[in-house]
C-alpha cells in the first residue's frame, strides 16, 4: 500500500481529544504544544491513545511498556502515569481503583 494514502496516514496518527501522537515522527502534541516525553512515557501514552476509554490494567501497561523485566509489585506504572499527568494539562488519565487506568476519551 502507498504510504501517502489516507488510510496509511490514519494508522500513523493517533488522536483523542486534543492529544495527537504521530508514530512516524515520534511526536506527541497537545493542541499546538509539543510534549517532551521519554521513551517510556511515549510508549505509555501510545497505549492509552490506542485504547481510549478502555481500562488498562497495571500488569498490561507494565508488560507493554517495560516488558517482563520488572516486578509486578513495582509502582513504576503509577510513577510514570504521574509523569504523564503532569505533562498533560487537564484530567486525561483516570485511575480505576484496584485495576489500573483509562484515558478519558471525552471531556
Write out the residue ranges for each language-model feature.
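Basic, amphipathic DNA-recognition helix from helix-turn-helix-like DNA-binding domains
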Residues: 1-15
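Intrinsically disordered, low-complexity protein-interaction/activation regions
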Residues: 4-7, 86-88, 105-107
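Short boundary/linker motifs that mark transitions into or out of structured domains
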Residues: 13-27, 107
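Positively charged, aromatic-enriched patches within helix-turn-helix-type DNA-binding elements
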Residues: 25-92, 97
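Minor-groove-contacting beta-hairpin "wing" of winged helix-turn-helix DNA-binding domains
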Residues: 99-104
